[in-house]
Design a protein with these regions (language model features):
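Non-cytosolic beta-sheet module surface loops
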Residues: 34-38, 121-123, 144
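Surface-exposed, short loops/turns at beta-strand junctions within beta-sandwich domains
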Residues: 68-75, 142-149
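Exposed beta-strand and adjacent loop surfaces of beta-rich binding modules
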Residues: 17, 29, 41-43, 76, ...
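Extracellular recognition modules
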Residues: 78-82, 151-155
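Short, exposed coil/turn segments at beta-strand boundaries within extracellular/luminal domains
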Residues: 1-5, 84-91, 156-165
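Short beta-strand segments within Ig-like beta-sandwich modules, predominantly Fibronectin type-III
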Residues: 56-62, 135-141
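Pro/Thr/Ser/Gly-rich low-complexity, intrinsically disordered linker/stalk tracts
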Residues: 6-37, 73, 90-115, 168-169
Length: 170
C-alpha cells in the first residue's frame, strides 16, 4: 500500500525532510535551525504586526541556521521562507517573549547541536554585550558545547559594566 501524497502532505515532508528543524523565539531574537527540506537559495522574510518587513535576506548557504536579532519583545512576527519569485515555501507566526523582570538573566539551551545563548530582560540603556565561554568571546549561537563557565559582559550607555555568569551543566 502506497499512501497518496496529495492526501497525506506529511508523507511529502517525511520523504523530503522538514523545512524547519527548530524554531526558538527569545525576547529580541529568533533562532531558526533549517531542516533537510529547506531551500538554501531561499529568502527569509520577517514582518511585524503592522505588516512592515523588518528582515529580508538570503539564507546563508554555509550555515544550517539563521539568527534574526533586534526584534521587539512581546511582538508577533510573521516568518516566511520564500522562493526568489516570493512564492511561500514555509511560514509561521512567532511571538517573541515579553520582558518579565527587572533583572537581566543569562540563559543557554542546546538546540540541534548548537548552544543558543539568550540575554533576557535587558533594559533599554544597554549599549552592547559580549558573551564568553571559559573566557573566550563567542557568538550567541555556538557550535562548541564543551565549556564550563558562560559569562555575559553587559555595557550600559553610562559606561558601567555588569557581569552575568553561569556554570554549564552537562
Amino acid at each position: 500500500y502506497n499512501p497518496n501524497p496529495l492526501l497525506y502532505p506529511d508523507f511529502i515532508a517525511a520523504r523530503d525532510g522538514l523545512t524547519v528543524s527548530s524554531l526558538v523565539g527569545g525576547q529580541r531574537e529568533l533562532f531558526i535551525s533549517w531542516g533537510n527540506g529547506a531551500d538554501k537559495t531561499g529568502i527569509l522574510s520577517v514582518t511585524d504586526e503592522e505588516g512592515t518587513e523588518v528582515v529580508r535576506r538570503s539564507l546563508d548557504s554555509e550555515n544550517d541556521y539563521t539568527l534574526v536579532e533586534n526584534l521587539a519583545p512581546g511582538t508577533t512576527y510573521h516568518v516566511a521562507l520564500l522562493k526568489s519569485d516570493d512564492a511561500v515555501l514555509w511560514k509561521d507566526d512567532v511571538k517573541t517573549k515579553s520582558v518579565t523582570g527587572k533583572f537581566p538573566l543569562l540563559k543557554y539551551q542546546q538546540v540541534d547541536g548548537y548552544m543558543l545563548v539568550q540575554l533576557l530582560n535587558l533594559p533599554d540603556d544597554v549599549s552592547s554585550y559580549k558573551v564568553k565561554l571559559d573566557g573566550q568571546e563567542i557568538n550567541i549561537v555556538n557550535k562548541n558545547l564543551n565549556g564550563q563557565i558562560l559569562t555575559a559582559e553587559v555595557t550600559y550607555k553610562d559606561g558601567s559594566v555588569e557581569m552575568l555568569s553561569t556554570t554549564i551543566r552537562k
